[in-house]
């Protein structure tokens, strides 16, 4: 009798290949062997504005060079974080080692993928330090944007070989001839020198890799000198501790030797040295010009600072490589858990995030209104938003963030100086001078919007620094503006006034003296610290009116009348009243004597009066969230 196979056992031919067996065999190539001759190495990066197809082009390169099999390929292969993949942006710089042959000669290409957003300019500048060339990638349908220019200037400062490339030539809206002329005008080359590729279809990518080999110079360095390597990124791995990405400049680095960090003097034993192709692979070491990773078992990212120089502990180099600076926070905001019992979880979450993000700073603070929380420092608004989103998503936290503000330097009348990152630290009494940070902003937009952009920038206390036409249709405007005016909703206003066509970039430009005041919001005569803000004297009454009107709508009515006031020092500049709820005390009186009714009304009036003197206003959590989030609506860049 023929027995049927039980349903739970899948029937499979004996010769059918098992997916899980061959999936684990990594693709290997000649690029997996380290200590390649420097003449055969090319280190390059891709610089582009957000959404110009940088990660898609990197995906095509991984596929064409064969380091990722077609079946394992996924979109944005190098973007590891969920947020990066969802938003379509690159936050952490990644690197990958690619094999490539030109006319039978074998080359090793190191591609370093960089972020495009202004907040992560420091990540870009470090990645550029590890390269000799850069692909300047521009969307053939949109043209050059402000952040592309900013990153191009960073690359030119470092004398990198620039390869101009137009991407997305397969789009129906693409106009490669027009934008090739624009690119050529900026870089100073011929329009015919601009390569045309499509990251989506792969058209022109092989020719681009050939150009990288031809135009990017090989790395230079002394193989016999003491080892020197520059750290351009470090990430935290929960199993292995800190993984440090380096580019070797001189000498060689091999496993099991002791290394020293030149900025701190700390020494560690090297447990593993390897390359990324595109997954980490241990190797025998790294030679001149090579890019790879080091694992020392250290648990704190701050011990391997990006931009620092690694050397050997014995007979190490005497002089560090240049280019290291501490990333400085530009924007501060308070983060508070909605549920007060989540405070320890938030502390632990920030600790873990800081392992991966050296630019994030935080310190505990308390607010009368919001309870315990942290004052966090960020590189910019996108950095702040992404940090908050990661905290909420990866650690299941519900957070309230206070309106962002910048760092002010205040000189008091007695000559002492304090640094203010929080409105509640603003000194009471006489202030001699206040200094606020200023930034140089670059706005690129169609020339029809010049008038509306100038009007917006002037309303934000901007000073025009210059204006250039990139082409008859596109213009570049340069303004110097206070950072405090940009961090609220400047980006949103700019986008809405230019129908989304304008792009913005900014960089630090020191500080300037300013006439700033602290506006307090008073409920029932008591200041609520969460709503305080530092604003320019001319904009104080506008801020006061906006907040009092908003709170009048958000705070529920009480048994007594509640005044909502905005004050600068002891001077009230705006006021709204939340009307009292009145119980109908005359409902029991059917007709009857008027004096009886009057007596009841007088009694109610007395009660309300007494309530007003001793009553407290409880602001519900939802009102805080609504007031602060609508106030900081500019946090969210338009997608």
From Swiss-Prot:
Enzyme class: hydrolase
Keywords for the protein's UniProt record, in alphabetical order: Cell membrane, GTP-binding, Hydrolase, Membrane, Nucleotide-binding, Protein biosynthesis
Keyword GTP-binding appears in the UniProt entry: yes
Binding site for GTP: 51-56, 167-170
SUPFAM superfamilies attached to this UniProt entry: EF-G C-terminal domain-like (SSF54980), P-loop containing nucleoside triphosphate hydrolases (SSF52540), Translation proteins (SSF50447)
PROSITE patterns: G_TR_1, G_TR_2
EC number(s) reported in the record: 3.6.5.n1
NCBIfam families linked: lepA, small_GTP
Protein name: Elongation factor 4
Species of origin: Mycobacterium sp. (strain KMS)
């Amino acid at each position: 009798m023929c027995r049927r196979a039980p349903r739970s056992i899948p029937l499979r031919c004996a010769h059918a290949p098992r997916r899980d067996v061959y999936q684990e065999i990594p693709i290997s190539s000649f690029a997996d062997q380290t200590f390649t001759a420097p003449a055969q190495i090319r280190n390059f990066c891709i610089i582009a504005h957000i959404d110009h197809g940088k990660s898609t082009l990197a995906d095509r390169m991984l596929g064409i060079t064969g380091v990722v099999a077609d079946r394992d390929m996924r979109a944005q292969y190098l973007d590891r974080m969920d947020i990066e993949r969802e938003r379509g942006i690159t936050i952490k710089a990644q690197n990958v080692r690619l094999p490539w042959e030109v006319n039978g000669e074998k080359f090793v290409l190191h591609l370093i993928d960089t972020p495009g957003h202004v907040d992560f300019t420091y990540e870009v500048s470090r990645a550029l330090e590890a390269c000799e060339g850069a692909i300047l990638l521009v969307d053939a349908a949109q043209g050059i944007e402000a952040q592309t220019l900013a990153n191009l200037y960073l690359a030119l400062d470092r004398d990198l070989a620039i390869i101009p490339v137009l991407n997305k030539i397969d789009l129906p809206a693409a106009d490669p001839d027009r934008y090739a002329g624009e690119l050529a005008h900026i870089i100073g080359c011929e329009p015919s020198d601009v390569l045309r590729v499509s990251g989506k279809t792969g058209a022109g990518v092989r020719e681009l890799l050939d150009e990288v080999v031809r135009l990017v110079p090989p790395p230079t360095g002394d193989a016999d000198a003491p080892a020197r390597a520059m750290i351009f990124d470090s990430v935290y791995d929960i199993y292995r501790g800190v993984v440090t990405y380096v580019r070797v400049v001189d000498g060689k680095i091999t496993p099991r030797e002791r290394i020293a960090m030149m900025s701190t003097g700390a020494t560690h034993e090297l447990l593993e040295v390897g390359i990324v192709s595109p997954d980490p692979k241990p190797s025998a070491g790294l030679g001149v010009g090579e890019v790879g990773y080091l694992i020392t078992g250290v648990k704190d990212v701050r011990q391997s600072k990006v931009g620092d120089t690694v050397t050997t502990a014995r007979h190490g180099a005497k002089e560090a490589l240049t280019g290291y600076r501490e990333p400085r926070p530009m924007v501060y905001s308070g983060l508070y858990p909605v549920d007060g019992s989540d405070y320890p979880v938030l502390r632990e979450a920030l600790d873990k995030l800081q392992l991966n993000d050296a630019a994030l700073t935080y310190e505990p603070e308390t607010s009368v209104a919001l309870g315990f929380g942290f004052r966090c420092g960020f590189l910019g608004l996108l950095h702040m938003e992404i940090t908050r989103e990661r905290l909420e998503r990866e650690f299941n936290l519900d957070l309230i963030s206070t309106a962002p503000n910048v760092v002010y330097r205040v000189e008091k009348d007695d000559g002492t100086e304090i640094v203010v990152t929080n409105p509640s630290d603003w000194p009471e009494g006489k202030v001699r001078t206040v200094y606020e940070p200023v930034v140089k902003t670059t706005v690129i937009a169609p020339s029809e919007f010049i008038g509306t952009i100038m009007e917006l920038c002037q309303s934000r206390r901007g000073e025009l620094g210059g204006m250039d036409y990139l082409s008859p249709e596109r213009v570049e405007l340069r303004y110097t503006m206070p950072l405090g005016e940009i961090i609220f909703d400047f980006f949103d206003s700019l986008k809405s006034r230019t129908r989304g066509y304008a792009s913005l970039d900014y960089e630090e430009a020191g500080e300037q003296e300013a006439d700033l005041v602290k506006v307090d919001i008073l409920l029932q005569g008591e200041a609520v610290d969460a709503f305080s803000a530092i604003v320019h004297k001319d904009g104080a009454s506008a801020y006061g009116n906006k907040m009092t009107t908003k709170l009048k709508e958000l705070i529920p009515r009480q048994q007594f009348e509640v005044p909502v006031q905005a004050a600068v020092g002891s001077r009230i500049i705006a006021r709204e009243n939340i009307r009292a709820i009145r119980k109908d005390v005359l409902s029991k009186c059917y007709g009857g004597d008027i004096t009886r009714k009057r007596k009841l009304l007088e009694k109610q009036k007395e009660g309300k009066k007494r309530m007003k003197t001793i009553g407290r206003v409880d602001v519900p959590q939802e009102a805080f969230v609504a007031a602060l989030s609508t106030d900081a609506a500019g946090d969210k860049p338009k997608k």
